[in-house]
A protein has these predicted regions:
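Contiguous, small/hydrophobic- and glycine-enriched helical/loop subdomains that border
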Residues: 82, 104, 108-145
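Conserved, helical-rich catalytic subdomain that frames metal- and/or nucleotide-binding sites
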Residues: 140, 145-241, 256-262, 266-269, ...
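Glycine/serine-rich anion-binding loops at beta->alpha junctions
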Residues: 86-115, 133, 240-255
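Short, conserved aromatic-histidine micro-motifs
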Residues: 122-138, 265-282
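Hydrophobic C-terminal alpha-helix "anchor/cap" residues
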Residues: 30-33, 128, 234, 268
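Short, basic/glycine-rich phosphate-binding loops at helix/coil junctions
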Residues: 46-59, 107, 202-212
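ATP-binding N-lobe of GHMP and related small-molecule kinases
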Residues: 1-95, 113, 117-125, 147-149, ...
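Residue-level signal for inorganic ion chemistry
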Residues: 11, 39-41, 66, 100, ...
Length: 286
């Protein structure tokens, strides 16, 4: 069984407060894009989980969310035998694009189908939050408002058709470190999440992009100015808006046409600002 694990971007990312349990209360608009990892899942007679990945530095044991996801369902339903899972990574690692969470989500979907466990999407999502806050959304996919710690999801009208250019510089940003360095009282500009939802519902791509924002940006760009350079390059070459996704360091630009996106991608590659450059489009459920 082959499955695609789609990357996500944050069209809007706001953080409201830090909770007593240490987690942060967020409001985000999430969007899947047509950039994906590929998983191949097969049954095997011997018990256990055999995981392999195309990058040798990625762990293949319980430190990997794919392994955790498979073990979660197989233990709960006392599945007979085991599975062999091959993960082909194409989504950049530690990029703010939920690659690991999406891999885990695809694993839950795959194990459910392979062993005919009969779980609904909602039942899978309820279990997914045990693995990570982004995993339920990666099962749901499409355009969604995420609240709470990211686990409270409301599907919204699909974002207008558009093209997305991904540019990841050759640096990694720890999500934990990004949260720890965030000064909540010092946030100057909060994205207009409600206004963005209204624009999405009205099919107003330009209105939506004008309101986009990510409260992580100022602090992370202060540490890594190359992120701002990539943003500026995209916006000066046709992007309606370029923004950092999640806690970074990946930058994405929203374009109205593939021609504009392809032209900007060529210039970005030639600039050597980004190690990964990838042009794609949004993925909508409908």
């Amino acid at each position: 069984m082959r499955l695609r694990a789609l990357a996500k971007i944050n069209l809007g990312l706001d953080i409201l407060r830090k909770r007593e349990d240490g987690y942060h209360e967020v409001r985000m608009i999430m969007q899947t894009i047509q950039m994906y990892d590929v998983l191949e899942i097969k049954k095997k007679k011997a018990p256990g989980i055999s995981l392999s990945v195309n990058y040798p530095y990625i762990p293949c044991d319980e430190r990997n969310l794919v392994y955790k996801a498979a073990k979660l369902l197989m233990d709960e339903f006392q599945v007979k035998g085991g599975v062999t899972i091959r993960l082909e990574k194409f989504i950049p690692v530690a990029a703010g694009m939920a690659g690991g969470s999406s891999d885990a989500a695809a694993t839950l979907v795959g194990i459910n189908r392979l062993f005919k466990l009969g779980l609904s999407e909602r039942e899978l999502m309820d279990r997914a939050v045990k693995i990570g806050a982004d995993v339920p959304y990666c099962i749901m996919r499409g355009t969604a408002l995420a609240e709470g710690i990211g686990e409270k999801l409301t599907g919204i009208t699909q974002v207008p058709e558009c093209f997305v250019l991904i540019g990841k510089p050759g640096i990694n940003v720890s999500t934990r470190a990004a949260y720890e360095s965030l000064n909540l009282s010092g946030i100057q500009n909060h994205p207009d999440i409600d206004g963005m939802i209204q624009d999405i519902q009205n099919g107003d791509l330009q209105g939506m992009t004008a309101k986009m924002g990510n409260v992580f940006e100022p602090g992370i760009i202060g540490q890594y100015p190359v992120i701002q350079e990539i943003k500026d390059l995209m916006e000066s070459h046709g992007a309606l808006k370029a923004m950092m996704s999640g806690s970074g360091p990946t930058v994405f630009g929203i374009f109205e046409s593939q021609e504009k996106m392809d032209a900007a991608a060529k210039i970005l590659r030639e600039s050597n600002l980004a190690k990964t450059v990838f042009g794609t489009r949004v993925f909508n459920r409908i």
